[in-house]
């Protein structure tokens, strides 16, 4: 009995990254051995993602309200530099995608359009959607995972409770701690969940369906890798004036890997919160910056919108001049920031970008269909980049503020 409890203790306290790697290898092996058995364990992945998505809204709401209510006077939260980093990173991603698309022009074999989808008609519609999400019913926001609304109500409640009694503030702090403990437990189940996700993905999709889009995927993944390993470290270096790679690699390993397999920025919010806690960042800062990043820090989405739009332009023989390409970068960056406010995310914002080149909605929706075909890889890589960057920029801004305080 003691040996059994000792084994469970080792399992609970062992390296989560190594356990996830074992889960990935086991999932691939099972899918290779038997597609039927692999499909049978798919529910493990669905349960894991479901648990993360279920805990994330209440975690964000309570953590934001608690951190603001308990905030000491004259506390610096560093939100302005973090938002600037988010916007800068998203624009840099769109610009990188434009340059790579020009260097390696890609053409598409257009598939049939996607039925039942209604892309936004313009930037105004994207902004309008976001504004209405801001004033959503708080209960509905929690039920539907509307993080713009959750943030707004969480901040509002936190400000209202800021002058309440210490006992009231302590209740919120205790509830926040309790929910964080639940999150830690769910995250420990990641190896089992990712085993189910990997097995199901390989069994149902494989890579035969996406082999025909090798060049398109190469440009997409190349742009994302360039942002993750060159541009983001460069931005971080400018902020913290030291080697950025230990921070960047850790965030990619601990946040990006989970996000890659869950393919959900919302589901990865608890993972990012736990990582920020490990990095000993200021709770008042990351309680707001992480859910905000899941909404507006969309470098991966900007790359997807830009690359697929320019691929459509190249397919139709449309000449893209430098000025239009720069305009596309701006539109893609702004659109990407609203991707969380659109059902279907970045792919359904492609028609909006295509309209810059006079590409018809019918053709644009065929490009969206291509996006869904390669989505198993594109969406996973996009989420990994988006989500890991949230922690990277939050950590960089916090460290820069600490360094400035020491010098000052």
UniProtKB/Swiss-Prot annotation:
Cellular component, GO annotation:
plasma membrane
TM region positions: 11-31, 43-63, 82-102, 141-161, 192-212, 216-236, 290-310, 316-336, 363-383
Q: Which domain of life is it from?
A: Bacteria
GO function terms (MF aspect): neutral L-amino acid:sodium symporter activity
The family database entries (Gene3D superfamilies) matched by this protein are listed as: Sodium:dicarboxylate symporter (1.10.3860.10)
Catalytic activity reported: L-serine(in) + Na(+)(in) = L-serine(out) + Na(+)(out); L-threonine(in) + Na(+)(in) = L-threonine(out) + Na(+)(out)
Q: Which SUPFAM superfamilies match?
A: Proton glutamate symport protein
| One biological process term in Gene Ontology | threonine transport
Record localization: Cell inner membrane
- Main localisation: membrane
For membrane topology, the record states: Multi-pass membrane protein
Q: Which UniProt keywords apply?
A: Amino-acid transport, Cell inner membrane, Cell membrane, Membrane, Symport, Transmembrane, Transmembrane helix, Transport
Provide the family line.
Belongs to the dicarboxylate/amino acid:cation symporter (DAACS) (TC 2.A.23) family.
What is known about what this protein does? Involved in the import of serine and threonine into the cell, with the concomitant import of sodium (symport system).
Protein name according to UniProt: Serine/threonine transporter SstT
Name the gene that codes for it.
sstT
């Amino acid at each position: 009995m003691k040996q059994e409890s000792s084994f469970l203790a080792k399992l609970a306290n062992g390296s989560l990254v190594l356990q996830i790697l074992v889960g990935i290898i086991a999932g691939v092996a099972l899918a290779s051995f038997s597609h039927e058995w692999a499909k049978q364990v798919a529910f493990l992945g669905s349960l894991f993602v479901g648990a993360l998505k279920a805990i994330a809204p209440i975690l964000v709401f309570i953590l934001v309200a608690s951190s603001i209510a308990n905030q000491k006077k004259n506390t610096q939260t560093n939100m302005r530099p973090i938002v600037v980093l988010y916007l800068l990173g998203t624009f840099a991603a769109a610009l990188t995608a434009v340059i790579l698309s020009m260097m390696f022009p890609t053409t598409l074999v257009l598939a049939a359009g996607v039925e039942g989808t209604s892309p936004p008609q313009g930037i105004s519609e994207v902004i309008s959607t976001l504004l209405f999400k801001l004033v959503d019913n708080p209960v509905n926001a929690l039920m539907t995972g509307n993080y713009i609304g959750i943030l707004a109500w969480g901040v509002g409640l936190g400000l209202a409770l800021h002058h309440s009694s210490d006992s009231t503030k302590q209740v919120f702090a205790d509830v926040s701690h309790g929910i964080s403990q639940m999150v830690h437990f769910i995250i420990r189940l990641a190896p089992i969940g990712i085993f189910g996700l990997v097995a199901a993905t390989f069994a149902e999709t494989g890579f035969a369906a996406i082999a025909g889009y090798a060049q398109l995927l190469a440009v997409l993944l190349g742009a994302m890798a360039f942002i993750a390993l060159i541009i983001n470290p460069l931005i971080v270096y400018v902020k913290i004036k030291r080697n950025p790679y230990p921070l960047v690699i850790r965030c990619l390993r601990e946040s990006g890997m989970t996000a890659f397999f869950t393919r959900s920025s919302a589901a990865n919010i608890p993972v990012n919160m736990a990582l920020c806690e490990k990095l000993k960042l200021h709770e008042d800062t990351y309680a707001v910056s992480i859910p905000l990043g899941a909404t507006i820090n969309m470098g991966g989405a900007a790359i997807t919108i830009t690359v697929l739009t320019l691929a459509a332009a190249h397919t139709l023989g449309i000449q893209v001049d430098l000025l239009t390409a720069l305009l596309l970068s701006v539109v893609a960056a702004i659109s990407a920031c609203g991707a969380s406010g659109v059902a279907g995310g970045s792919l359904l914002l492609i028609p909006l970008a295509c309209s810059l080149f006079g590409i018809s909605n019918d053709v644009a929706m065929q490009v969206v269909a291509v996006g869904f075909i390669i989505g198993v890889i594109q969406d996973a890589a996009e989420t990994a980049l988006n989500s890991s960057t949230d922690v990277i920029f939050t950590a960089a801004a916090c460290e820069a503020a600490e360094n400035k305080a020491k010098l000052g």
